[in-house]
Amino acid sequence: MSCQQNQQQCQPPPKCPPKCTPKCPPKCPPKCPPQCPAPCFPAVSSCCGPSSGSCCGPSSGGCCSSGAGGCSLSHHRPRLFHRRRHQSPDCCESEPSGGSGCCHSSGGCC
C-alpha cells in the first residue's frame, strides 16, 4: 500500500452535528400545592363505613372498632383465651357490615 492510501483510511470520522439546545423552562414556576391540614389517622370514609357504626382514630389505636366490639390494639398482646379471636395484634374482628376490619401497621384499616 502506498502512503497516500494509508492516510485516507486513517482520517478521523466527520464530526457529529451539534446537539439540539434544550428547550427553555416555562416562565412561570409551578404553583405550590395547597397546604394539607394536619395529618390524622385514616379518614373515617377510607376506614370504616358509617353503616357499620364504627369509627377509626387514636382512641381505638387506629383500628376500626365494630359494633360487636373488637379492636385488637397493636400494642396489646392477645391473651391466651383470645388467641383464636385475635390472629394478629394488628387486626380487628370482622365487622357486621362485611368489612374485614384488618388494621395495617400504619393504623389504616382495610
Swiss-Prot record:
Residues 1-10 have a biased composition (Low complexity). Residues 1-23 are annotated as: Disordered. Residues 11-23 have a biased composition (Pro residues). Skin-specific. Expression was readily detected in adult trunk skin, adult arm skin, fetal skin, penal skin, vulva, esophagus and tongue. Not expressed in the cervix, rectum, lung, colon, or placenta. InterPro entries: LCE. Pfam families: LCE. GO terms for molecular function: identical protein binding. Belongs to the LCE family. Precursors of the cornified envelope of the stratum. Belongs to the LCE cluster present on 1q21. Interacts with CYSRT1; the interaction is direct. This is Late cornified envelope protein 2C. It comes from Homo sapiens (Human). The gene is LCE2C.
